[in-house]
Swiss-Prot record:
GO terms for molecular function: DNA binding; zinc ion binding. It holds the Pfam family FlhC. This is Flagellar transcriptional regulator FlhC. Heterohexamer composed of two FlhC and four FlhD subunits. Each FlhC binds a FlhD dimer, forming a heterotrimer, and a hexamer assembles by dimerization of two heterotrimers. It comes from Pectobacterium carotovorum.
């Protein structure tokens, strides 16, 4: 029976703690560390105060193709790709660093970001397996996540250059709200004076 290294176990615990703090699911923890499932559950409960969520990991590439999710996924993956190509880091450390960069750029509007860490990790695995790839937009030349061999060459247009109509409607609603609030505040100031 091989004896486990105490140093390696400490590194795995530290990595698991960092992943849990970023919202990793149990399956990701099991895949990226050598800790037992029981120890990971115990660690998760200790850090989060509740057991890890149950259920399967996302296994479809469809989620990454909807317009808003695609923009967020592409931002994350471009950061990840940059870190890998420039030798900054590799493996799960590259996922963590690029996810932190993503969080800095896309501050969540609610309690949780649109792109969760486990989904970002799954995206990396989808690209590595050839199910998804980065494709260049014909208009802006930005690199976006797209299914491999799905689009004819040189015909891809990203959802920033050609947003779907529901995205434009949502943008108009939010702009109207931003226009309305200052007027309401001005009226409140006039009534107070």
């Amino acid at each position: 029976m091989a004896e486990k290294s105490i140093v390696q176990e400490a590194k795995d615990i530290q990595l698991a703690m960092e992943l849990i703090s970023l919202g990793a699911r149990l399956q990701m923890l099991e895949s990226e560390t050598q800790l037992s499932r029981g120890r990971l559950i115990k660690l998760y409960k200790e850090l989060r105060g509740s057991p890890p969520p149950k259920g399967m990991l996302p296994f479809s590439t469809d989620w990454f193709m909807t317009w808003e999710q695609n923009i967020h996924s592409s931002m994350f993956y471009n950061a990840y790709s940059f870190l890998i190509k420039n030798g900054q880091c590799s493996g799960v450390k590259a996922v963590i660093k690029s996810y932190r960069l993503y969080l800095e750029q896309c501050a969540p509007q609610s309690d949780s970001p649109l792109l969760a860490l486990t989904r970002a990790w799954t995206l990396v695995r989808f690209v590595d397996s050839g199910m998804l790839q980065l494709s260049s937009c014909n208009c802006c030349k930005g690199m976006f996540i797209y299914p491999r061999l799905h689009q004819p060459k040189n015909s891809f247009v990203c959802s920033l250059c050609q947003p779907p109509s529901r995205a434009v409607k949502r943008l108009k609603l939010s702009q109207n709200l931003a226009d309305i609030i200052p007027r309401l505040l001005d009226e409140q100031v006039k009534h107070a004076v």
